Amino acid sequence: MPVAGSELPRRPLPPAAQERDAEPRPPHGELQYLGQIQHILRCGVRKDDRTGTGTLSVFGMQARYSLRDEFPLLTTKRVFWKGVLEELLWFIKGSTNAKELSSKGVKIWDANGSRDFLDSLGFSTREEGDLGPVYGFQWRHFGAEYRDMESDYSGQGVDQLQRVIDTIKTNPDDRRIIMCAWNPRDLPLMALPPCHALCQFYVVNSELSCQLYQRSGDMGLGVPFNIASYALLTYMIAHITGLKPGDFIHTLGDAHIYLNHIEPLKIQLQREPRPFPKLRILRKVEKIDDFKAEDFQIEGYNPHPTIKMEMAV
């Protein structure tokens, strides 16, 4: 029997045993979204809504998605990446013209900017496509007086987005790094009040994280889009400020499933998540306004097929 300290060297563990001894891998981030869908289907309360479609609704949900070397573009159905990217660039530009986005092949705001829809809200003198002071206007010109989608608002109102970036650079421990699209004075002028209303940024260990408060979440169509959009915004701001992306925390108020989305979502729940893709920014960009669609590349996105769901207007 060997004396203490003279034990023979241990044989290396076989690969399977090494895996067992290693740190357990965290569960796939998409399982949080699928779990939210299951919870709403099981526990949601039947509620009427503005669109007349009807929903199952739960109040108050949260999920946390890692942005470290992965990008939360859901895989249990194909998410319209071009739409996510072009809409965010359109917000950053401060545009409120739905036709501008539509001209790039992204039609997601067409219904809310249509002649019939604007007329139904009493905006009969407003040009078709003019959504009013929605997200982009509030991000870049909060407090300015809105006239129309063609006016030049340079230097007017508070540029919340640039203020966020400047504060991250100069005072990253600040607890007030907030951007808010909910402007009570302007709500009556909007074709659609903001669903994703407020986001806050947080810096620690050279990582940038973002938490979004979304007052209203269409779980089938909108929420997968919103997750990717604010994850992308976090990547962009991290790039400009010399930080690494950390987490995206998604807090939902009224989390709902439209009744006509129940069957499509049951199909989605039967699918196994695949690895999230990676997002590459292909050149060094110094200013948020200088980003272009061709600066971004999604790698390794291998989703399940598209699932058709109708938008409630």
Curated annotation (Swiss-Prot):
Compartments in which it is found: Nucleus; Cytoplasm; Mitochondrion; Mitochondrion matrix
Pfam families recorded: Thymidylat_synt
The entry's keywords: Cytoplasm, Disease variant, Dyskeratosis congenita, Isopeptide bond, Membrane, Methyltransferase, Mitochondrion, Mitochondrion inner membrane, Nucleotide biosynthesis, Nucleus, Phosphoprotein, Transferase, Ubl conjugation
SUPFAM superfamilies: Thymidylate synthase/dCMP hydroxymethylase
Residues binding dUMP: 50, 175-176, 195-196, 215-218, 226, 256-258
InterPro entries from the UniProt entry: Thymidate_synth/dCMP_Mease, Thymidate_synth/dCMP_Mease_dom, Thymidate_synth/dCMP_Mease_sf, Thymidylate_synthase, Thymidylate_synthase_AS
Binding site for (6R)-5,10-methylene-5,6,7,8-tetrahydrofolate: 218, 312
Entry's Gene Ontology cellular component terms: cytoplasm; cytosol; mitochondrial inner membrane; mitochondrial matrix; mitochondrion; nucleus
Effect of residue 87 to K: In DKCD; uncertain significance
Disease: Dyskeratosis congenita, digenic: A form of dyskeratosis congenita, a rare multisystem disorder caused by defective telomere maintenance. It is characterized by progressive bone marrow failure, and the clinical triad of reticulated skin hyperpigmentation, nail dystrophy, and mucosal leukoplakia. Common but variable features include premature graying, aplastic anemia, low platelets, osteoporosis, pulmonary fibrosis, and liver fibrosis among others. Early mortality is often associated with bone marrow failure, infections, fatal pulmonary complications, or malignancy.
NCBIfam families: PRK01827.1-3 (NF002497), thym_sym (TIGR03284)
Name listed for the protein in its UniProt record: Thymidylate synthase
Originating organism: Homo sapiens
Gene that encodes the chain: TYMS
